[in-house]
Amino acid sequence: MTPANPKPLANHHIAVLLGGPSAEREVSLVTGAAYAAALERLGARVSRVDPGKDVAQVLTALAPDLVFNGLHGRWGEDGCVQGVLETLGLAYTHSGVLASALAMDKAKSKAVLAAAGIPVPGGGLFDRHDVAQGHVMPPPYVVKPNAEGSSVGVSLVFEGANGPPRQLAAPDWAFGEQVMVEPYIPGLELAVAVVGESNGPRALAVTEIRSSTGFYDYDAKYSQGGSIHVLPAPIPDAVRDRALHLAKLGHTALGCQGVTRSDFRYDDINDLLVLLEVNTQPGMTPTSLVPEQADHAGVSFDRLVFWIVEDAYARRFAGGIA
């Protein structure tokens, strides 16, 4: 993973996708900027692309050696932009079309993960209007858009609540007609970063996330001080090893490539570890988990970015980086 040359990407033209039209645009702008800066430090010529409807024409005109995907949310991590890049014949980073689409769809990804023997939450899909009208399961439970990331649109309904979140019935609700409703799992929030390597995926570490509000929502993820990351997580060795194993298994079961982040809940009273989801485009902001875990494993951010590029080239071209 360590480049011998301090400028190993000299003479390489890399287009970084950042921003985009999703609800996670602001996070993507920060992630993409971090990627672009690292690539420039590694010697690459970088074109920053905030994709719109003309993204195919823009990328065709740029003709980059590689597209570095720094997008989050719909269109950027659900298989759509990956399909565009496949059609254009461009090498790109992170997971491909099918894995991206599966991981973004909570219902489908849970089915795949469960079939692989991975513990996942119960619950199911409901029409958002039905959920807004009354409890579809006894509280506490969690309501999530079926195809969003970064906890966008997520609500926690506590015991004693008079009813479910009213915003589900709002005319300006923009997160799809179906929502995933799952029983709330008490305990610890854990995360594991995984990097795919030629001899199999490697899980970096286990982080415990402690939110200042008690709920790891969008603000807790991306606001300074919104959460505290405890690395390594203060959990028994057996639980750590189980989380590392399940994260690698989830990465493989969904067919992911490059880097992913698996999010877990651990009920420490009942010793229950549950995989919530696998993120194929994990954040790379100053408050993000993957760069922290890489650093903990002795991998600098620039080395991590170089590895992502190296992995993408190796998948597209037999000779890897020229």
Swiss-Prot record:
List ligand-binding residues for Mg(2+) 1. Answer: 263, 277
What are the binding positions for Mg(2+) 2 in this chain? 277, 279
Domain (ATP-grasp): give its ranges. Answer: 110-310
The EC code for this enzyme is 6.3.2.4
- Example GO molecular function: D-alanine-D-alanine ligase activity
UniProt keyword list: ATP-binding, Cell shape, Cell wall biogenesis/degradation, Cytoplasm, Ligase, Magnesium, Manganese, Metal-binding, Nucleotide-binding, Peptidoglycan synthesis
Domain of life of the native organism: Bacteria
Q: Where does ATP bind?
A: 137-191
Q: Mainly localized where? A: cytoplasm
Q: Where's it found, cell-wise?
A: Cytoplasm
Q: Name the cofactor(s).
A: Mg(2+); Mn(2+)
Q: How is the cofactor bound?
A: Binds 2 magnesium or manganese ions per subunit.
Q: What Gene Ontology terms for biological process does this UniProt record contain?
A: cell wall organization; peptidoglycan biosynthetic process; regulation of cell shape
Q: Which GO CC terms are listed, alphabetically?
A: cytoplasm
What pathway or pathways are given for this protein in its record?
Cell wall biogenesis; peptidoglycan biosynthesis
Q: What is the reaction catalyzed?
A: 2 D-alanine + ATP = D-alanyl-D-alanine + ADP + phosphate + H(+)
The family classification in the record reads: Belongs to the D-alanine--D-alanine ligase family.
Q: What does this protein's UniProt record list under function?
A: Cell wall formation.
Q: Which NCBIfam families match?
A: D_ala_D_alaTIGR, PRK01372.1
How is this protein named in the record?
D-alanine--D-alanine ligase
